[in-house]
Every structure is written in C-alpha cells, then in structure tokens.
Amino acid sequence: MTAILITGYRSFEIGIFDHKDPRVSIIKQAIRKDLIGYLENGVDWFIFTGNLGFEQWALEVANELKEEYPLQIGTIFLFETHGDRWNEKNQEVLSQFRAVDFVKYYFPNYEQPTQFSQYYQFLLEKTEGAYVFYDTENETNLKYFLKKAKDMPHYQLLLLTFDRLNDMSQS
C-alpha cells in the first residue's frame, strides 16, 4: 500500500470564494495531471484532512479518477467536530469527505495546541509522501507541516506552486 497525503491552501487563503471561479478549473487540471502521475507510479491511497479549497477540488478529481483507476480515498479529520459549524453549502462538501472509503478522526475535540503537531506527525508517519498546494510566497500554517515533512528522510513531497499553475494556464 502506498498512501499520499493531499493538502494545501484553503479557498479563502487564495481568495477563491466561488466554485465557478476560473482559477478552480486550472487548479483541477493540475491536480488531475499530478494524481494520474501518482496512480501510474503505484499509489493506491489518497488521504485528506477535510479542508475546503484545494483538498475539496482534489477530492472531486480523485472521485472522478476512481472510475478509471483502482484507488482508495481516506479522510482523517483532526477533530471529530471538524466542520460542525460550517454553513449548509460547506456541509455538503464535508459530507463528501465523510463518504470516502476510510474515515477517522484523530482527537475527539480540541484540548491543547500540541494536538496539531501530534496530528501532523501521525499523518507523516502513515503516508509515504504528500501532494501540497503551497508556495513560500504566500505562507500559511502549512509551513510547519512542510518543515516536518522535509526533515523526514525518504518522504516524497510534490508541491503545486503558483508558478506551475501559471505555466499550465499559459499552455
């Protein structure tokens, strides 16, 4: 079994507030290309954390690819209460994350800040690599996860950056 964690910017972090935003189409094209590359190299599990934005779009693409490839999808939420306060539209997305092949949560609820570090360490230990939509020009809390990932020998990181997206949109 080979599992890849998929994570990245949440929609509000990159100023996308509408699913019909033309940038979503370009991002999904890049996702499709990269996920197919993973599948053709033996990856059989895609793991998500259940966030809106990049993960949501990647989940949609992964579900489409299930028709062509033998793949499994898992969601490991940080907390059991993840998304409970989201609006109705976002609850529909949350239900898609809960309708995958494997669903778990790491903690029942928030108790202390160290839970985040423990969660990321768990994800790193249970996956062989990560596909991350992230650019150092637009930092978020993902920088802590990426630092841990880069410190792990043999952990494979594939970054989708704004430069890669610009190249794709021009071709």
Curated annotation (Swiss-Prot):
Signal peptide span: none
Source organism superkingdom: Bacteria
Coiled-coil region: none
Family matches, as InterPro entries: YspA
Residue ranges of the TM segments: none
HAMAP family, alphabetized: UPF0398
Family of the protein in this entry: Belongs to the UPF0398 family.
Name under which the protein is recorded: UPF0398 protein M6_Spy1399
